[in-house]
From Swiss-Prot:
Annotated GO biological process: gluconeogenesis; glycolytic process
Catalyzed reactions: (2R)-2-phosphoglycerate = (2R)-3-phosphoglycerate
Source taxonomy: Bacteria, Pseudomonadati, Pseudomonadota, Gammaproteobacteria, Enterobacterales
InterPro entries recorded: His_Pase_superF_clade-1, His_PPase_superfam, PG/BPGM_mutase_AS, Phosphogly_mut1
Active-site residues, Swiss-Prot/TrEMBL: 11, 89
Family (UniProt): Belongs to the phosphoglycerate mutase family. BPG-dependent PGAM subfamily.
Site (described: Transition state stabilizer): 184
The species this protein was found in: Yersinia pestis
Purpose of the protein: Catalyzes the interconversion of 2-phosphoglycerate and 3-phosphoglycerate.
Record's keyword annotation contains Isomerase: yes
Entry protein name: 2,3-bisphosphoglycerate-dependent phosphoglycerate mutase
Gene: gpmA
Amino acid sequence: MAVTKLVLVRHGESQWNNENRFTGWYDVDLSEKGRSEAKAAGKLLKDEGFTFDFAYTSVLKRAIHTLWNILDELDQAWLPTEKTWKLNERHYGALQGLNKSETAEKYGDEQVKQWRRGFAITPPALEKSDERFPGHDPRYAKLTDAELPTTESLALTIERVIPYWNDVIKPRIASGERVIIAAHGNSLRALVKYLDDLGEDEILELNIPTGVPLVYEFDENFKPIKHYYLGNADEIAAKAAAVANQGKAK
């Protein structure tokens, strides 16, 4: 049976991950730890014999720079890459820039958990006059008004991620190309929910650690056979738990 593989990587720790702030579409860069995580991910992939034919990433530098570091470790800096806003992080609306723990102290752990991990719940929306609204950013100049979010739930994130998966990424993989996707916690949660057919309660508890390669294997009918992280299982579990704890009051 022919097995097709796909590699997903959440960007390495960003400067705002380090500061425990809601990031969303704000274009913050990797921290030093994040760059190290990305390089370690590339080394893991190299050690496991992975090479790629094509890469996808978002238009946010923390994902782009994660991909660059991975490809540098693989000696594949030349790899053809498509950047798309459809793989951006979920837009966190008016929460963008706020400290997660301080927000939890103000609104409660459960409310912040729902804002962070709930399926159909949107954080408070931005006003379009707010400088954080993506309509003011030239990289989104070609997006329609309907495509420019003032806030997003995971359900809304799925509405842009999954059509892009089905229309663009999946056909490339089905043609035999080896693909890596470097993206974000929630755009990858959207894809994982779809691939694994997870329920709303299941996706609420799913936390994807930064900078750890997640490998999916598919059968000839493009059904997932299994998925697994590369690396030390205990370290990966600890990183996922740390992600879950970011939204709790101190």
